[in-house]
Amino acid sequence: MATPQRLTDPEIQTALGELGGWSLQGNKLHRQFKFANFNQAFGFMTRLALVAETLNHHPEWSNVYNRVTIDLTTHDAGGITELDVKFATKANSFAD
């Protein structure tokens, strides 16, 4: 599979405008999700793990009780790509 192309700054800003709750931290998309309890947070991560495998694109993430923090970047491309935007979009849809 070819390495995806890194998005330009205007493309990243457009994506952020469409991705509620996400921000830019360095060269990563960043968001913290809050759930009612640990079970919901872990269930969210489990569903997203299947997406990560399907996309062959794995997040930097952590879980503390009812919070899940996600940072997305494509290391091979040296920044944010469409894969990161796809993953963030899916994360938002699972959190709603």
Curated annotation (Swiss-Prot):
Xref: Gene3D superfamilies: Transcriptional coactivator/pterin dehydratase
Molecular function (Gene Ontology), one example: 4-alpha-hydroxytetrahydrobiopterin dehydratase activity
Reaction catalyzed: (4aS,6R)-4a-hydroxy-L-erythro-5,6,7,8-tetrahydrobiopterin = (6R)-L-erythro-6,7-dihydrobiopterin + H2O
Keyword Lipid metabolism belongs to the record: no
GO biological process terms on file: tetrahydrobiopterin biosynthetic process
Pfam families in the record: Pterin_4a (PF01329)
Keywords: Lyase
EC number, UniProt record: 4.2.1.96
Enzyme class name: lyase
CDD domains (UniProt xref): PCD_DCoH_subfamily_b
Similarity comment text for this entry: Belongs to the pterin-4-alpha-carbinolamine dehydratase family.
NCBIfam families: PRK00823.1-2 (NF002017), PRK00823.1-3 (NF002018)
Name this protein carries in UniProt: Putative pterin-4-alpha-carbinolamine dehydratase
Organism field: Synechocystis sp. (strain ATCC 27184 / PCC 6803 / Kazusa)
Lineage of source species: Bacteria, Bacillati, Cyanobacteriota, Cyanophyceae, Synechococcales
